[in-house]
C-alpha cells in the first residue's frame, strides 16, 4: 500500500489488498477488529486506488509511506534486511508481518521534539506513551517514556 498526501494506492488489485489487510488485522488482534476494518469506509483498505503506471504516479504524487505486509514474516524480514542498504529511509514494523517505509525524518520522536519546542516546552516536561515499533523514536528522545504491558516487544 502506498500512502500519499491525497489517498491510498496499490500496484495490485485493491480488493485483494483489502482482503489480505483485513485478514492480517484479524490474525494479530481479533476477528471483530477485522470486521470493523471491513465495514468502516474511512479505513485505508476500503479506499485503495490501483496504480496502472508507476512512472507518472511517482512524478505527480507526494509519497508519505509505503507499507508491505505478508502473513509469513520471512519475506518481511528479507525486505527489512535489504532496506538496511539505503540511507535516507526509515523502516519499522507495527507487527511481525508488516514493514512500513518512510523518509528518515518522518518519525514520531522528531516530530514531537519540533512540536514541543514550538509550544515552549522542554523534553523533561513531556511524557510519551507507545505500544509499537513506530513509537521507538519517541522513547529514544524522551526520558519519560511508557508502554503498556501488552505492547509490541519488537
Residue map of PLM features:
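Acidic helix N-cap motif at the loop->helix transition within catalytic regions
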Residues: 154
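Conserved acidic, metal-coordinating active-site core of Asp-based
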Residues: 3-129, 133-138, 150
Amino acid at each position: 500500500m502506498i500512502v500519499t498526501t491525497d489517498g491510498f494506492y496499490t500496484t495490485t488489485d485493491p480488493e485483494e489488498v483489502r482482503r489480505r489487510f483485513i485478514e492480517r488485522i484479524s490474525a494479530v488482534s481479533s476477528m471483530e477488529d477485522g470486521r470493523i476494518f471491513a465495514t468502516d469506509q474511512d479505513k485505508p483498505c476500503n479506499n485503495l486506488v490501483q496504480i496502472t503506471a508507476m512512472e507518472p504516479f511517482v512524478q505527480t504524487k507526494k509519497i508519505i509511506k509505503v507499507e508491505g505486509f505478508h502473513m509469513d514474516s520471512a519475506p518481511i524480514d528479507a525486505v527489512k534486511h535489504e532496506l538496511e542498504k539505503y540511507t535516507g529511509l526509515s523502516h519499522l514494523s507495527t507487527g511481525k508481518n508488516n514493514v512500513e517505509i518512510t523518509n528518515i525524518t518522518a518519525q514520531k520522536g522528531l516530530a514531537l521534539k519540533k512540536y514541543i519546542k514550538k509550544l515552549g516546552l522542554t523534553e523533561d516536561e513531556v511524557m510519551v506513551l507507545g505500544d509499537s515499533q513506530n513509537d521507538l523514536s519517541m522513547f529514544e528522545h524522551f526520558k519519560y517514556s511508557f508502554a503498556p504491558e501488552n505492547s509490541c516487544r519488537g
